[in-house]
């Protein structure tokens, strides 16, 4: 410690010395008077101090209470009660009084012993090193986390699982078809094994850089999107060791209480859809529990003035918002309109009608709104309940809304007539205003923008060929044949978009403008990111027609993916399908394992594997069983009754 410096003499007040000869007698008399005065002052101060000290002494009863407070609380002292017959006489006396005093003494001894034990434990803690204390704290934290996991993973009330048909099988009799199916399985194994090695736990994989990849739709957290998305594909293909690896990761690591902003739409179709499908296929309770946990985290997104959910929600805070690029802060039709299948199953499995009410509210609101030319615009403001920009598309921003109207009807065992009517009305408007034929005879689905038709079709819109075929049965005015043919025409157009490229892989979108047909013009539209929609349409049309061309076209696509997208670390998209020397984008999308490879595998499987009269595939290709109940009331669900 530094010694403080002495104050300089010039800074002190020192009275000057009088060095002249004193007048001695006068000086003594003055001193005597001063001494008496000082003594009197001291005496007065002493008396005042004593009196004040006596006056301000603490109340002895309060001091006693403070000193014995613990004993007063823990040891009931025996006093004469106010209501006693003889005041001043103890109520407890004789042997009872003696026994009470013994108990009181034992209690005092116990308090002293506990106090000494606590002191010893405190001393022991102080003697431990900082590392030991940290280790103990971490152990306690781990214990609390484990207890929370046990509580979170508590089984939900049992609900009868629908009759599940065709979760195994599909072995083709033809050797050539069997070999092709095995090749698709090997491609799945290559994609999964490399993700397992280089991207495990991350949402997706960068197969060239050989590291994890997390797009912003899943937020900043490692939620294992590829694991959840691929589970049912692994199960269907009989890759059970890989399935168990994924299941263990989900049990130990999948946590939704993270400070991460995610897309409500994407986590619904990929995570909730994937977990529900894995539950129905395997019967493992953990998948149902995790699906419900995530669904609860999505519910705050519906806290808007209209009940139309936000596009994004923070899983921890529940704060929602919409995409900055969306028209006037709007929600997207294909996003808030693609929740029905998963939410109906959540209500079925939990008995909680909240999920059912959320999606039915969206449906009722849409039914009341005016629709220009009978078409649903892609943008709806969740604050005002008004349409945004008048842009209608069966491709991106609109696609799966129409798909889920049809599939809501199918999933209800064709009893949700309201959904079927909405689908039929929408398809009639689409056919009237959006579906056109090119000069070369190709049927395409354009986009309606601000009163005019843009003659451009996106890869995402190619799913519609399968949708038209799937919805043919039950269509109005006995038009089943018409819609099956319309689906086939869309499939042919999308196949042409593949066949007119150098890689035999389709671009992201393609135009029909003059001499240009089914070809991408802009560089940003020439990429292929392992999308499934064309192969999805091939599979549906194969199931309904058994026309061999769909297997042939599917195999062409599989060979092109194998040749141009396969790399040592997995599969990657390509940036230009018109270049014979493509550049890879270095992303293995989770939907490649969930959809593209699953549809290829089913294309070369028998119809008894996941038959369409028992299963409905969500927009991420996760199969959910048909519920044989009226989904407008869920009256057939014992959990609800």
UniProtKB/Swiss-Prot annotation:
Chain segments carrying region Disordered: 153-175
Pathways involved: Protein modification; protein glycosylation
Keywords noted in UniProt: Acetylation, Calcium, Disulfide bond, Glycoprotein, Glycosidase, Golgi apparatus, Hydrolase, Membrane, Metal-binding, Signal-anchor, Transmembrane, Transmembrane helix
One cellular-component annotation, GO: extracellular exosome
Glycosylation sites (chain numbering): 631
Cytoplasmic topology ranges: 2-36
GO molecular function: calcium ion binding; mannosyl-oligosaccharide 1,2-alpha-mannosidase activity
Inhibition and activation profile: Inhibited by both 1-deoxymannojirimycin and kifunensine.
Catalytic class of the enzyme: hydrolase
UniProt record, GO biological process: carbohydrate metabolic process; ERAD pathway; Golgi apparatus mannose trimming; lung alveolus development; N-glycan processing; protein glycosylation; respiratory gaseous exchange by respiratory system
Bilayer topology annotation: Single-pass type II membrane protein
Any Pfam family hit: Glyco_hydro_47
Keyword Calcium part of the UniProt annotation: yes
UniProt cross-references to InterPro entries, sorted A to Z: 6hp_glycosidase-like_sf, Glyco_hydro_47, Glycosyl_Hydrolase_47, Seven-hairpin_glycosidases
Tissue expression per record: Highest levels of expression in placenta and testis.
Residues holding Ca(2+): 619
Catalyzed reactions per annotation: N(4)-(alpha-D-Man-(1->2)-alpha-D-Man-(1->2)-alpha-D-Man-(1->3)-[alpha-D-Man-(1->2)-alpha-D-Man-(1->3)-[alpha-D-Man-(1->2)-alpha-D-Man-(1->6)]-alpha-D-Man-(1->6)]-beta-D-Man-(1->4)-beta-D-GlcNAc-(1->4)-beta-D-GlcNAc)-L-asparaginyl-[protein] (N-glucan mannose isomer 9A1,2,3B1,2,3) + 4 H2O = N(4)-(alpha-D-Man-(1->3)-[alpha-D-Man-(1->3)-[alpha-D-Man-(1->6)]-alpha-D-Man-(1->6)]-beta-D-Man-(1->4)-beta-D-GlcNAc-(1->4)-beta-D-GlcNAc)-L-asparaginyl-[protein] (N-glucan mannose isomer 5A1,2) + 4 beta-D-mannose; N(4)-(alpha-D-Man-(1->2)-alpha-D-Man-(1->2)-alpha-D-Man-(1->3)-[alpha-D-Man-(1->3)-[alpha-D-Man-(1->2)-alpha-D-Man-(1->6)]-alpha-D-Man-(1->6)]-beta-D-Man-(1->4)-beta-D-GlcNAc-(1->4)-beta-D-GlcNAc)-L-asparaginyl-[protein] (N-glucan mannose isomer 8A1,2,3B1,3) + 3 H2O = N(4)-(alpha-D-Man-(1->3)-[alpha-D-Man-(1->3)-[alpha-D-Man-(1->6)]-alpha-D-Man-(1->6)]-beta-D-Man-(1->4)-beta-D-GlcNAc-(1->4)-beta-D-GlcNAc)-L-asparaginyl-[protein] (N-glucan mannose isomer 5A1,2) + 3 beta-D-mannose
Localization, UniProt: Golgi apparatus membrane
Cysteine disulfide partners in this protein: 462-494
Chain positions with N-acetylthreonine modification: 2
Stretches assigned to the Lumenal side: 58-641
E.C. number(s) listed in UniProt: 3.2.1.113
Family: Belongs to the glycosyl hydrolase 47 family.
General function of this protein: Involved in the maturation of Asn-linked oligosaccharides. Progressively trim alpha-1,2-linked mannose residues from Man(9)GlcNAc(2) to produce Man(5)GlcNAc(2).
Protein name: Mannosyl-oligosaccharide 1,2-alpha-mannosidase IB
């Amino acid at each position: 410690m530094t010694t403080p410096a002495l104050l300089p003499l010039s800074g002190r007040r020192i009275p000057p010395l009088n060095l002249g000869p004193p007048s001695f007698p006068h000086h003594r008399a003055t001193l005597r008077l001063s001494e008496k005065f000082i003594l009197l002052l001291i005496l007065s101060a002493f008396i005042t101090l004593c009196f004040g000290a006596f006056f301000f002494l603490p109340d002895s009863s309060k001091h006693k209470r403070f000193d014995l407070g613990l004993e007063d609380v823990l040891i009931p002292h025996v006093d004469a009660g106010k209501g006693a017959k003889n005041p001043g006489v103890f109520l407890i006396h004789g042997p009872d009084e003696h026994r009470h005093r013994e108990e009181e003494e034992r209690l005092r001894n116990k308090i002293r012993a506990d106090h000494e034990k606590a002191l010893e434990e405190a001393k022991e803690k102080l003697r431990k090193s900082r590392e030991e204390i940290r280790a103990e704290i971490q152990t306690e934290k781990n214990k609390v986390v484990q207890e929370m996991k046990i509580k979170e993973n508590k089984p939900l009330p049992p609900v009868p699982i629908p009759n599940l048909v065709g979760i195994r099988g599909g072995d083709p009799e033809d050797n050539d078809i069997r070999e092709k199916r095995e090749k698709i399985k090997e491609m799945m194994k290559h994609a999964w094994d490399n993700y397992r090695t280089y991207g495990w736990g991350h949402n997706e994989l960068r197969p060239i850089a050989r590291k994890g990849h997390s797009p912003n739709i899943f937020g900043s957290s490692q939620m294992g999107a590829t694991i959840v998305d691929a589970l049912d594909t692994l199960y269907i293909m009989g890759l059970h060791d890989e399935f168990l690896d994924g299941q263990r990761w989900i049990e130990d690591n999948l946590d939704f209480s993270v400070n991460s902003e995610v897309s409500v739409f994407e986590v619904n179709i990929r995570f909730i859809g994937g977990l529900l499908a894995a539950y129905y296929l395997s019967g493992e309770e953990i998948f149902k529990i995790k699906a419900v946990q995530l669904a609860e985290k999505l519910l705050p997104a519906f806290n808007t003035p209209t009940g139309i959910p936000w596009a994004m929600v923070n899983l921890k805070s529940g704060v929602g918002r919409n995409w900055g690029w969306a028209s006037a802060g709007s929600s997207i039709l294909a996003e808030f309109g693609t929740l029905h299948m998963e939410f109906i199953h959540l209500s079925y499995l939990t008995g909680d009608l909240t999920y059912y009410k959320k999606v039915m509210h969206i449906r009722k609101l849409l039914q009341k709104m005016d629709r220009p030319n009978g078409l649903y615009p892609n943008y709806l403001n969740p604050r005002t309940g008004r349409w945004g920009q008048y842009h209608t598309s069966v491709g991106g921003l609109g696609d799966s809304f129409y798909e889920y109207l049809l599939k809501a009807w199918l999933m209800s065992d064709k009893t949700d007539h309201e959904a079927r009517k909405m689908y039929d009305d929408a398809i009639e408007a689409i056919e009237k205003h959006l579906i056109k034929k090119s000069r070369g005879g190709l049927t395409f689905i354009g986009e309606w923008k601000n009163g005019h038709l843009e003659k451009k079709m996106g890869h995402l819109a190619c799913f519609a060929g399968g949708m038209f075929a799937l919805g043919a049965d039950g269509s109005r005015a006995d038009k089943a044949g018409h819609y099956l043919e319309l689906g086939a025409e869309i499939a042919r157009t999308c196949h042409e978009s593949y066949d007119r490229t150098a890689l035999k892989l389709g671009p992201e979108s393609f135009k029909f403008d003059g001499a240009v047909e089914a070809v991408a013009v802009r560089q940003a539209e020439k990429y292929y990111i392992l999308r499934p929609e064309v192969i999805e349409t091939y599979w549906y049309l194969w199931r309904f027609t058994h026309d061999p061309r769909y297997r042939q076209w599917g195999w062409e696509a599989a060979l092109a993916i194998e040749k141009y997208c396969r790399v040592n670390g997995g599969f990657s998209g390509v940036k230009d399908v018109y270049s014979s020397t493509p550049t890879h984008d270095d992303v293995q999308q989770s939907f490649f394992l969930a959809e593209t490879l699953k549809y290829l595998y089913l294309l070369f499987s028998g119809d008894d594997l996941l038959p369409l009269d028992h299963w409905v595939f969500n927009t991420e290709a996760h199969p959910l069983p048909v519920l044989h109940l009226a989904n407008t009331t869920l009256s057939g669900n014992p959990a609800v009754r």
